[in-house]
Amino acid sequence: MAQAVVPAMQCQVGAVRARPAAAAAAAGGRVWGVRRTGRGTSGFRVMAVSTETTGVVTRMEQLLNMDTTPFTDKIIAEYIWVGGTGIDLRSKSRTISKPVEDPSELPKWNYDGSSTGQAPGEDSEVILYPQAIFKDPFRGGNNILVMCDTYTPAGEPIPTNKRNRAAQVFSDPKVVSQVPWFGIEQEYTLLQRDVNWPLGWPVGGYPGPQGPYYCAVGSDKSFGRDISDAHYKACLYAGINISGTNGEVMPGQWEYQVGPSVGIEAGDHIWISRYILERITEQAGVVLTLDPKPIQGDWNGAGCHTNYSTKSMREDGGFEVIKKAILNLSLRHDLHISAYGEGNERRLTGLHETASIDNFSWGVANRGCSIRVGRDTEAKGKGYLEDRRPASNMDPYVVTALLAETTILWEPTLEAEVLAAKKLALKV
């Protein structure tokens, strides 16, 4: 279990079994009647273990994990939004009179935008519009996490609201007809809180060279597995379409995959999965960073590789459609790079399984290219492409919408298309 030391107690986070009644009673605590079936079930628990004040902490644990469903129809909704930096997440809670199934059943809300860098002090109110609902793995029961986007009181999206523009792209009839699928590989790095140095690294020093750590097992090679596993289970409970996890090449770095997701859902699921990860690392006393190159030198950076396909790409003859998409992406390389995350120039150097930020390239099974096509896709003549350029701190609404726009809605001039095809050795 991941542990964070706090005054007079330790906090553990993870998926744990309920404490037996006898053990709880022996500790001086009370066993709450919690339903174990249906939507009210939560396998994700916050557990506080006392070193000095056992009775007090046991009661705290019970309150944190208490399922209120048998006692009230009211639920807690955690409203979540993207903050002023465009990468930070904010949230606050409110009571809703009864369980809800759709975001349209939830009220709009507001917050102080001057405290998040999203509005001036003299006109600070920013309005939250509920857009997607997920089950709350921290509170359990019928409680929910709510992904919101942000608007002025007049109903205009504020500059950091990238979801609004993405929703417009994904509602375009041409895009809808192509049913765009996204599979996003979110990499992240765990840091020791007081020193901001990767988990498992000696303070002020370095571990052995890369090689033994990717998908590794063992206490000398894998650092943070408890956090990765707790996050995996919490995402499954929440209803996020998480499809896998693995330890990464750099020690202390991990990856999880979300998808395939259709359209705007991809962005919603990545943002909520990031929120859940932030909450878990908060409880574990570990710092989460999405910096694309947290450690300079001969160490891998952190990306957010985005696998993408359209209906036409997935059908027979789809490889030709993929090649046309690659051609379009090459012609808008600079636009995509500018939208693919802050600090990406430190990562896209042409080393450590990346392409150069300055040059567009593509290849089959080549992880040193901007766009990779899998051998399976080449062999079958249909499938998907992988855009390896996005940084770990990218906005998934921006990246997914831009991929759809460039490959479905945007048409280059014939002259530009011919020149690009010749340069990339693409026959389209």
UniProtKB/Swiss-Prot annotation:
The encoding gene: GLN2
Its EC number(s): 6.3.1.2
Keyword line: ATP-binding, Chloroplast, Ligase, Nucleotide-binding, Plastid, Transit peptide
EC category: ligase
GO molecular function list: ATP binding; glutamine synthetase activity; mRNA binding
InterPro entries: Gln_synt_N, Gln_synt_N_sf, Gln_synth/guanido_kin_cat_dom, Gln_synth_cat_dom, Gln_synth_gly_rich_site, Gln_synth_N_conserv_site, Glutamine_Synthetase
Domain GS beta-grasp intervals: 75-155
GO biological-process terms attached to the record: glutamine biosynthetic process; response to cadmium ion
Catalytic activities: L-glutamate + NH4(+) + ATP = L-glutamine + ADP + phosphate + H(+)
Pfam family, one: Gln-synt_N
Region (Disordered), start-end ranges: 95-120
Residue span of the annotated presequence: 1-48
The family this protein is said to belong to: Belongs to the glutamine synthetase family.
Protein name: Glutamine synthetase, chloroplastic
Domain GS catalytic intervals: 159-428
Miscellaneous comment: Plants overexpressing GLN2 show enhanced photorespiration capacity.
